[in-house]
Amino acid sequence: MADTTGRIPLWLVGTVTGIPVIGLIGVFFYGSYSGLGSSL
């Protein structure tokens, strides 16, 4: 394995944290279009 100075690659952090954020935003917009966004 290549030594990355003990740090997690930035692209991996962005992917792991980005997918749930995009999912939550998608659910939020879907809920608002369905009329459920007002309850959040």
UniProtKB/Swiss-Prot annotation:
Protein's cellular compartments: Plastid, Chloroplast thylakoid membrane
Protein's UniProt keywords contain Membrane: yes
GO CC, alphabetical: chloroplast thylakoid membrane; photosystem II reaction center
Chief location of this protein within or outside the cell: plastid
UniProt keyword terms in alphabetical order: Chloroplast, Membrane, Photosynthesis, Photosystem II, Plastid, Reaction center, Thylakoid, Transmembrane, Transmembrane helix
Transmembrane segments: 8-28
SUPFAM superfamilies: Photosystem II reaction center protein J, PsbJ (SSF161021)
InterPro entries xrefs: PSII_PsbJ (IPR002682), PSII_PsbJ_sf (IPR037267)
Highest taxon of source: Eukaryota
One Pfam family per UniProt: PsbJ
A single BP term in Gene Ontology: photosynthesis
Membrane topology: Single-pass membrane protein
Family to which the UniProt record says this protein belongs: Belongs to the PsbJ family.
Described function: One of the components of the core complex of photosystem II (PSII). PSII is a light-driven water:plastoquinone oxidoreductase that uses light energy to abstract electrons from H(2)O, generating O(2) and a proton gradient subsequently used for ATP formation. It consists of a core antenna complex that captures photons, and an electron transfer chain that converts photonic excitation into a charge separation.
Family annotation (PANTHER family): PHOTOSYSTEM II REACTION CENTER PROTEIN J (PTHR34812:SF3)
Subunit annotation: PSII is composed of 1 copy each of membrane proteins PsbA, PsbB, PsbC, PsbD, PsbE, PsbF, PsbH, PsbI, PsbJ, PsbK, PsbL, PsbM, PsbT, PsbX, PsbY, PsbZ, Psb30/Ycf12, at least 3 peripheral proteins of the oxygen-evolving complex and a large number of cofactors. It forms dimeric complexes.
Matches recorded under HAMAP family: PSII_PsbJ
Protein name: Photosystem II reaction center protein J
